[in-house]
UniProtKB/Swiss-Prot annotation:
UniProt family annotation: Belongs to the complex I subunit 4L family.
UniProtKB keywords: Cell membrane, Membrane, NAD, Quinone, Translocase, Transmembrane, Transmembrane helix, Transport
Membrane-topology descriptor: Multi-pass membrane protein
A single GO molecular function term of this UniProt record: NADH:ubiquinone reductase (non-electrogenic) activity
Role, per record: NDH-1 shuttles electrons from NADH, via FMN and iron-sulfur (Fe-S) centers, to quinones in the respiratory chain. The immediate electron acceptor for the enzyme in this species is believed to be a menaquinone. Couples the redox reaction to proton translocation (for every two electrons transferred, four hydrogen ions are translocated across the cytoplasmic membrane), and thus conserves the redox energy in a proton gradient.
Signal peptide segment: none
Full protein name: NADH-quinone oxidoreductase subunit K
Compartment(s): Cell membrane
Length: 104
């Protein structure tokens, strides 16, 4: 059975992170920005699992930390979507340019 080299995982994670970063910085829809942030977190999880597999001391610590970050990302997504729903109810929009001020 052939093993995939570490560099493949790192390049994949880099591509996913760059796509997420580009979307988070350029898009004006807050839902899309939230999805891009989640994509960046998934790229970090790929790195965690890859380094856990190919590191000097392979073990389960990388997978456990990846599961922890997935849990945190799920909570972040739930809170983010709840905030977006409240903003949409008040402002009738989800575009960043129109909801950037805190006053009502």
């Amino acid at each position: 059975m052939s093993s995939v080299p570490l560099s493949v995982y790192l390049v994949l994670a880099l591509i996913l992170f760059c796509i997420g970063l580009y979307g988070a910085l350029t898009k004006r829809n807050t839902v899309i920005v939230l999805i891009c942030i989640e994509l960046m977190l998934n790229a970090v999880n790929i790195n965690l699992v890859a380094f856990a597999k190919y590191g000097a001391h392979p073990g389960i610590a990388g997978q456990i930390f990846a599961l922890f970050t997935i849990t945190v990302a799920a909570a972040e997504a739930a809170v983010g979507l709840a905030i977006l729903m409240a903003l949409y109810r008040n402002r009738k929009t989800v575009h960043i340019d129109e909801i950037d001020s805190m006053k009502h």
